[in-house]
């Protein structure tokens, strides 16, 4: 055995390749073994080095991994019909084994038999024991491990009898020791590169082969000091390994050296070495200003800015002659950086390979199985059924996608949920596409559909029967046909990576079903259990990843770094929390148990002590990282990372302690003191030109040079990029609307406009909202809560029936109320049983009705105010109050109550589910049209009677804070005060109104006859103005805005506050408020009244 070592600042691979070339010249076959995590990149690097930079192949040199070696030597065919279980199959077998135990046999683990996490830990423990050359008998004796021994012993017995699983590597090692391959190994050289420690399984292999090959070479990193200093060294793991091998074998230990060593990286390595040994020394290691060329530390504003700066530097170096493959980006948190990095690199047109395993969980086929499981488990919840159909895997091959949208609309609107409702015919005949939706429902969800045949009953079936039934579902439900169509479409469009993903997912399904068949073939299971087991295998599966191109930027976890990785290294997202990365032991064996095992086992039997191994690994990872670049290394930390303030890692602090100020660089999104640093490519400059412009405008310093520079860039982009020209032309009009054409106006409005009163209040809130909801009849799904229309109709109907009673009195009021409440409650039950929110709302309605009814009861008791009509309509067929129009605008509505004073004055009562009061300012701005319109209607319907006014009554059950009252007797008065009418009255009737109980009369809402007439005229003018704009085809996006309110916490002006249509209009308050909003509340009540009395309204 030869062990070649060198310091990590030097090129180990160069020395090992010299040996490889010597051996190839002797016609020996060279097996070059590298760690699994870097085998692809290492193979590419070695072949390029051997061919002096160009791609090539060397027949007698194989870059491989330990576990692949048996395939090169053992050519025997497997003569077994047994199934070999993969990770998914092993998890299934562990699940089956756990189900076979009784609770008293494994009390600690019995409840975890279906836990995916526990099953994964069992697989991990078994794999660790194999790698450590241990068996369950080596586990320390305690109650927990006794249960694990039972589980693993039963598992291994079942596995060895029924399945073709065994350790090929372990078997190969045993056969090596027996001399079976001695003849083949005579002309073989084995070179090992990149290892600082070996597992027990690998060390046993080394022991078995090292004397049988022509030459056995281990290359690693160390120095003379480490070989004598013991644990106080940065190479502690390597020194322990070398010492162990020297004690076991005759070892030729040699140091290899290189003349080309980067002094900056040597400084950093020396700093780490001294720090790891806690040495106090007079030696001062400084990073100077000129070292910036090779090493920098960034402190970036945030992740986005950090990645953008990497992208800009890559583009600039590419323009100077570098290749994309010369760059490697290492990330501290691969998952957190994945989406942002991909978006930014795409913007900067940087090809990259992100070495982060991508889960199959988002593939339509996996979503189909997730939805199938959820449907059965949750009894056909609406969203689960919709998700199943929207996966577009289970569907009729000729089904129009639009029908799925109709189906989703229907089931959401009518709250369809539960198997019974989906298997029965949909009955809401007013839905325009009911026939299409029912046809699809019958085919895909009806009682004879493939899905119902598969999920239809809860009987247990054997595993083989479930596999057979699923196969029928996949065929009859067109799942196979659709998957084939997806694959073919991707291939036709040259989207080969997507086609490969479709193929991988399908192969994973087949593999999972085969392993399920092998494990659960004769086991009886319910459908939920079958789908749960199947889904566990699919959800955790990952796509195989292969770079689509050689000239790409490699992006990967920083823990996968090795020395001399690439020319330019950017290690980003390194904070105190992840650099170095602290890992907790989450396995089934504690660190103490691992130590106990290692103290009692034989040679070539040991298990990793994770606390020790992680410390050594972290130390070597940091060491590898600072020596990973050949030309330039950047270590970077964002100030804000995952919404938390970032802190410098201790490693950063060590390097900055004696560093020139140029080493630490603050990275900002736009910094006007920089110019060329912000130039990446034209697309990225276009993306940030607005930000640069704002910085120039807001900058207090007058920096003409920078202004001239960016103006020049701006002009170049405008001239050279037609798309940018179009963007600029459209910027000022990004949400401008286009007037409707005359023929369109004729079709939608004709000569007359028919609309409700409330729709015009919507018009004055925002014209575009009116257009979408009233002209285009766009509807949003309504959840049944206390503010929904259904609840409002419920209240109205109860009180209409009560107040219509001719013999109603204070004495029989409660009895009549109860009777009608029960009747209406029964009629509305189908709405209030649709979901949990509706049921909760229903449970509160009676209390609200009874609380509000106390006011009505008081009204019934008085002779001063009598109800003439309830729910009287206008503008509808057979309306009690006739038609009402303003010019060519025909209005419709319904007045809740028409009440008459004893003096014959008429007025209006309007019921509301939320708090309302009459505000003159809102009437002036067109936001409150109802009251004045209702009063205008009754004035027209009853021309000979005077008007007293209009009042709101809110339906509510007023909560009371008992801590704020002294005696329980106060509650009745508090409730009475809270339940009051509120609105506007005319001065002539004010005195009489004041005398009626439960009416809150404000002096500011009392108007004389002249003011009242002016308000009516103003109200009619609102309709005329709106009608004129509609007939002219003018529709603006102009939500109302009150200057004193500005933008609220949710980022909205007042007109957008409750609007569900912002995704359509794209109004953004901070951008469009000044140009596209309508300002209200600009005049006080006194100014409005003065205007009404005098010169009329300003236009």
Curated annotation (Swiss-Prot):
EC number(s) stated in the UniProt entry for this protein: 3.1.-.-
Record keyword Calcium present: no
GO molecular function annotations of the record: 4 iron, 4 sulfur cluster binding; 5'-3' exonuclease activity; ATP binding; double-stranded DNA binding; helicase activity; hydrolase activity, acting on acid anhydrides; metal ion binding
Names of the cofactor(s): Mg(2+); [4Fe-4S] cluster
SUPFAM superfamilies hit by this protein: P-loop containing nucleoside triphosphate hydrolases (SSF52540)
Binding residue positions for [4Fe-4S] cluster: 766, 1056, 1059, 1065
Superkingdom to which the source organism belongs: Bacteria
Cofactor: binding comment: Binds 1 [4Fe-4S] cluster.
Gene3D superfamilies: 3.90.320.10, P-loop containing nucleotide triphosphate hydrolases
Record keywords: 4Fe-4S, ATP-binding, DNA damage, DNA repair, DNA-binding, Exonuclease, Helicase, Hydrolase, Iron, Iron-sulfur, Metal-binding, Nuclease, Nucleotide-binding
Biological processes per GO annotation: double-strand break repair via homologous recombination
Known function: The heterodimer acts as both an ATP-dependent DNA helicase and an ATP-dependent, dual-direction single-stranded exonuclease. Recognizes the chi site generating a DNA molecule suitable for the initiation of homologous recombination. This subunit has 5' -> 3' nuclease activity but not helicase activity.
Homology family: Belongs to the helicase family. AddB/RexB type 2 subfamily.
Subunit structure: Heterodimer of AddA and RexB.
Additional remarks: Despite having helicase-like domains, this subunit does not have helicase activity.
Protein name: ATP-dependent helicase/deoxyribonuclease subunit B
